[in-house]
UniProtKB/Swiss-Prot annotation:
CDD domains: GTP_cyclohydro1
Listed GO CC annotations: cytoplasm
Binding positions (Zn(2+)): 75, 78, 146
Subunit and partners: Toroid-shaped homodecamer, composed of two pentamers of five dimers.
Name the record gives this protein: GTP cyclohydrolase 1
Catalysed reactions, semicolon-separated: GTP + H2O = 7,8-dihydroneopterin 3'-triphosphate + formate + H(+)
Top-level EC class as recorded in UniProt: hydrolase
Length: 185
């Protein structure tokens, strides 16, 4: 498949009026194909692989939050990056997952062609699925280069999305606690 992606990048360069054989571009199709495979590696991963067995029994029933998880994704409409941070919380109900696994779940879904709204929901549903928790909250704030570099060219625009499941959706106190804690330095 990488050869096909590489050939496509070569054709794009030609269609732009460039010479893909000139010194500065000679290896660009191969590098771009390799970069695209990396930036979309989430398609090659699944939840079981990402968790790698790191689900543990626990009596803890208090909120678990992982804040400021950097994320890098590609807008499915323009193939341009969006860059931001995710905050993920869940209320355990008999089990917890390894700390790094929350970040790995974010990465698995972010490393696909995405829109932020779907990314937020996919992360929440995955955390709910693996923890069986009483609730899950995901908040993402990101800057979209498709809006900054082209179109309306708004350099300071940011997009925020949230998904609240279970107690985070049904209980305003739980939701507010999460929202307050992710804003605390």
């Amino acid at each position: 498949m990488s050869e096909r992606i590489e050939a496509a990048y070569r054709r794009i360069l030609q269609d732009l009026g460039e010479d893909p054989d000139r010194e500065g571009l000679k290896d660009t199709p191969a590098r771009a194909a390799k970069a695209m495979r990396f930036l979309t590696k989430g398609y090659q991963e699944d939840l079981d692989q990402v968790l790698n067995g790191a689900v543990f029994s626990s009596d803890n029933d208090e909120m678990v939050i992982v804040r400021n998880i950097e994320l890098y994704s590609l807008c499915e409409h323009h193939l341009l990056p969006f860059i931001g941070r995710a905050h993920v919380a869940y209320l355990p109900d008999g089990k917890v997952i390894g700390l790094s696994k929350v970040a790995r779940i974010v990465d698995m879904y972010a490393r696909r062609l995405q829109i932020q709204e779907n990314l937020t929901r996919q992360i929440a549903l995955a955390v709910q699925q693996v923890t069986g928790g009483k609730g899950v909250a995901v908040y993402i704030n990101a800057r979209h280069l498709c809006m900054m570099m082209r179109g309306v060219e708004k350099q300071n625009s940011e997009m925020s999305t949230s998904v609240m499941l279970g107690d985070f959706r049904e209980n305003p106190k739980t939701r507010n606690e999460f929202l307050q804690l992710i804003r605390t330095p």
